[in-house]
Regions:
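Conserved phosphate-binding catalytic cores of ATP/NTP-utilizing and phosphoryl-transfer enzymes
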Residues: 1, 179-207, 393-408
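Conserved phosphate-binding/catalytic loops in two-lobed NTP-binding clefts
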Residues: 175-183, 187, 373-397
Length: 564
């Protein structure tokens, strides 16, 4: 392992490193503190660590000695806090005053703001951050046997220098000797495989648990060396996954004919609301992939009313259509559209044309909500939206940066296939003409083959059409998120995802057409067309078609579809 990188998120934290054996970044799994190790988590993001902390009172001699600052630079002994899943589990029923569910936002602007207390001592944002990072580094040592001495940390693109200074002071006091910072949009660009040889404008849509942030940044090779991106415009709204959980819970409660008061001072009511919010999150994530899911947790007594068919109550089933309606009623889609349009309108020299935005990067688990990808696809085109690893992109990019292994040039990130039909069965045949990982531009005849027109109706063929599909697949045990032409989300690979591949037609409804003159007889099984495909510098798949019977060139490097 090498090239350590930390993506400190508001809700979840990812720790990644560069795997020399496989030549790629990987998230480090810390089973004792991560989300749901080896579970049936529908999103399969178990290696993320919840960014929560409960500060403990130092009771034992080892704990007190381990918290001595001069010693912490050299070794991390004892335990000063619970972090991640153990902290969540311990505070699920009754939250301790020493439990801090979020500290990143306060650390950025008010590091001395009290967020809790342990005994008579206040827990400031800075103390909470230090306790979390200390235990995270200690867990890495326990799990891998290695101390992290060289680390890249991702930071929000508009983070104040004070935020960087706070993190630097904390991490250096914990024994990190070489520390570098990398702007999150730049890390996401590297994680999604963007080459930064030339200047490009990138829009990062980051929707996490707490916020919806849309940033338009300009990336340059020089900025990569410094780990910085130039911010052209940014919009932030308090509209993330946590708000959606509340909307889902309210929707389900209305359907069941009950209410759980969010402002109640009664501990039992607050406990039930916390538990039901967690269930709302589970159901919400389940319908990312399923048509519907049942809400399994109900307050005492209500289950009997539902089973008895009490007036105003019914089983708590949430469908994907229900979730879309909840998002619409809550203003989620309107907020996203408004943020995108406002960012485009606030360029430093005036409005920025859509064509000048080269890439759209989706970051954060809430970008998987129904309707988000289709909204961006419709606005910018499928060929610009990179969305297959919203949880890992920032951490992967930072690990690549840490190991100095980022890709200097652009490459094609999906397989693209040319669709033909079997002469006997008429079934579609998908032949990959541009494999994933291809650098571009290529030669105009990067792929070439001689083809026989199908004559599917048994009559002379007068037309030929070029239909191209995107093929979503993954390698090894990893998983990717892929959207089909209807905008539905699929998980490819992983433990519970779809096996094999997902084929997405790109131009089936409007294929590139050519005419055969004279028509091709169905009895003639000799090749009639020589078809060549290539990729130009703008990622257009181009086609050259030669009529072998007449010797005429029917197409000469004609653009077919835009690739990603």
């Amino acid at each position: 392992m090498g090239g350590w990188a930390l993506d400190l998120g508001t809700t979840n934290t990812g720790l990644a490193c560069w795997d020399e054996a496989n030549g790629q970044p990987q998230l480090v799994e810390l089973p004792r503190i991560c989300r749901r190790p080896r579970s049936d988590d529908p999103l399969e993001a178990p290696t993320l660590v919840p960014t929560v902390v409960e500060v403990l009172s130092a009771t034992s001699l080892l704990d007190r000695l381990g918290a001595w600052p001069p010693l912490e630079r050299w070794m991390l002994r004892g335990r000063t806090a619970l972090i991640g899943r153990p902290a969540l589990d311990r505070n699920q029923a009754l939250a301790s005053p020493a439990f801090v569910p979020a500290f990143k936002a306060a650390l950025a602007v008010e590091p001395l703001r009290p967020l809790g207390r342990v005994g008579r001592q206040l827990i400031t944002a800075r103390r909470a951050a230090r306790a979390f990072l200390r235990e995270l580094l200690a867990e890495v040592k326990r799990e891998t046997g290695r101390r992290i001495r060289d680390l890249v940390v991702t930071v929000p693109v508009d983070a104040y220098e004070g935020y960087r200074a706070q993190l630097e002071e904390i991490l250096r006091s914990l024994g990190v000797r070489r520390l570098r910072f990398l702007d999150e949009p730049l890390a996401a660009a590297l994680g999604y495989g963007l080459g930064l040889v030339s200047e490009r404008n990138v829009m990062v849509v980051d929707i996490g648990g707490g916020t919806m942030n849309v940033a338009l940044v300009r990336l340059r090779a020089g900025g990569l060396r410094q780990g910085r991106a130039e911010v052209l415009a940014k919009q932030g709204r308090a509209c993330g996954g946590n708000a959606v959980d509340s909307w889902v819970l309210d929707h389900v409660c209305r359907r069941m004919g009950c209410a759980v008061d969010a402002l109640s001072e009664q501990e039992e009511v607050r406990l039930w609301r916390r538990m039901m919010l967690a269930e709302a999150c589970r159901v919400k994530e389940a319908v990312f992939f399923l048509p519907s899911a049942e809400f399994l947790l109900t307050p005492p007594g209500l289950s009997r009313r539902v089973r008895a068919g009490a007036p105003g109550s019914q089983a708590a089933l949430l469908s994907r259509d229900d979730l879309v309606e909840v998002l619409r009623e809550g203003g989620f889609y309107a907020s996203l559209s408004a943020s995108v349009e406002q960012v485009l309108s606030e360029g430093p020299g005036g409005p920025i044309p859509t064509d000048d935005v080269h890439d759209i990067l989706m970051v954060g688990g809430s970008t998987l909500l129904p309707g988000v990808f289709p909204l961006l696809e419709q606005r910018f085109g499928r060929h610009r939206v990179r969305a297959w690893q919203p949880f890992e992109a920032v951490a992967f990019g930072a690990a690549s940066f840490a190991a100095d292994r980022y890709v200097p040039h652009d490459y094609i990130v999906h397989d693209y296939a040319f669709v033909t039909h079997d002469a006997r069965t008429r079934d579609p045949v998908y032949t990959v003409v541009v494999p994933r990982g291809t650098r571009f531009p290529t030669s105009h005849d990067f792929w070439k083959a001689r083809l026989v027109p199908t004559c599917s109706l048994g009559e002379p063929e007068t037309l030929f059409k070029l239909v191209v599909c995107e093929i979503g697949r993954t390698e090894g045990s990893g998983r990717r998120f892929v959207w089909d032409a209807a905008g539905d989300l699929y998980k490819i690979g992983g433990k519970t995802g779809t096996d094999g591949r997902l084929v997405v037609p790109l131009n089936e409804s409007n294929p590139t057409l050519g005419r055969l003159d004279p028509p091709h007889s169905p009895r003639d099984r000799r090749p009639r067309l020589e078809v060549s495909f290539g990729v130009d510098r703008d990622r257009w798949l181009t086609a050259t078609v030669l009529d072998l019977q007449t010797g005429r060139t029917l197409m000469d490097r004609q653009a077919v579809v835009r690739l990603l």
